[in-house]
Design a protein with these regions (language model features):
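Second-shell residues forming the walls of enzyme active-site clefts
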Residues: 70-242, 249-253
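Nucleotide/pyrophosphate-binding catalytic subdomain
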Residues: 5-12, 20-24, 48, 54
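Acidic-leg catalytic submotif of subtilisin-like serine proteases
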Residues: 26-38
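Glycine-rich anion/phosphate-binding loops
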Residues: 11-29, 60-68, 110-113
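Active-site-proximal loop/short-helix segments
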Residues: 1-5, 36-56, 82-103, 133
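Active-site loop-helix segments enriched in His/Asp/Glu that coordinate
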Residues: 50-66, 210-215
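C-terminal extensions of enzymes
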Residues: 248-269
């Protein structure tokens, strides 16, 4: 009737409630197992192009993606966990798999900001971290977003005002270390990511062999600091610490018996 407020349909309410429940279950289970951070949510749009993104995306519409991501992040927060929106400014419109190749998105900056990147400023007040894409946006910068000062410092920090932590994507991926025709070593890739504006660099699945490759990177970073090629950043360290949970996690047995956990399970599809 006149003056009455429109309310979402039951399907929409189920979707948002399920997203919050999924965030809570994910974060509470991880924390009960000793894991204090998860690189979620995926904010990429489902253009039907990317096999590596695919059903990891919430939807094609950036408004739907933002709504469901916000609900999921609320669930993460209820369990004491931060979040990481990825892959900035959007990985869903390219076919190539950035784990092995270097995808190229030829759209204009205006088109990207109006569509794929739209969730980032919309969620700016609740995003605690962002992970850039290993994608080249050729009409914006010749370097992949994760190595691009234009994307990370000028656009994400400057234009969008993001103040949280910026993680590199996994630099152990072959496609992640290709920059302007050069294949970078692990240490070179880490330094390039930090120089571009990342606060933290990820080098995953390199703990084999006693972690010798990781030790080498740390040793070479120390050498680079002595040579003046890189210096630890106090602000980056503050951003990292801000991602850590402030309250103790439940143990597994008490979690799975808790009423809020069981209610969350009931809300999942």
């Amino acid at each position: 009737g006149k003056g009455a407020k429109a309310v979402p349909g039951s399907g929409a309410l189920r979707a948002t409630n399920a997203a919050t429940a999924a965030g809570y279950v994910l974060a509470s289970e991880l924390r009960a197992c000793g894991v204090d951070f998860s690189f979620t949510p995926v904010l990429d749009l489902d253009h039907g192009e990317s096999g590596v993104i695919g059903d990891r995306a919430f939807a094609r519409d950036p408004r739907v993606v933002s709504l469901l991501a916000r609900c999921l992040m609320q669930g993460l927060l209820q369990a004491g966990m931060g979040n990481c929106g990825k892959h900035f400014p959007g990985h869903g419109a390219v076919k190539a798999d950035s784990h092995t190749d270097i995808p190229v998105d030829k759209r204009s900056l205006k088109a990207i900001l109006a569509d794929d990147a739209a969730p980032y400023p919309w969620l700016g007040s609740v995003l605690t971290a962002v992970m850039p894409a290993h994608v080249i946006y050729s009409r914006v910068d010749a370097r992949p977003a994760g190595f691009s000062k234009r994307w990370l410092q000028d656009i994400l920090r400057g234009q969008m005002g993001f103040q949280g932590a910026i993680f590199s994507d996994d630099l152990s991926m072959a496609g992640a270390r290709q920059v302007q025709g050069q294949s970078l070593s692990y240490t070179e890739a880490v330094l390039a990511a930090l120089d571009a504006g990342c606060d933290l660099a990820l080098l995953c699945n390199r703990s084999v062999g006693g972690g010798a490759e990781l030790d080498q990177v740390l040793d070479e970073l120390a050498e680079a600091a002595v040579k003046g090629q890189w210096q630890p950043n106090e602000v980056s360290e503050e951003r990292r610490l801000a991602l850590l949970p402030s309250a103790a996690a439940r143990d597994w047995e008490s979690l799975v018996r808790s009423a809020d956990y069981m209610r969350a399970l009931d809300l999942l599809p």
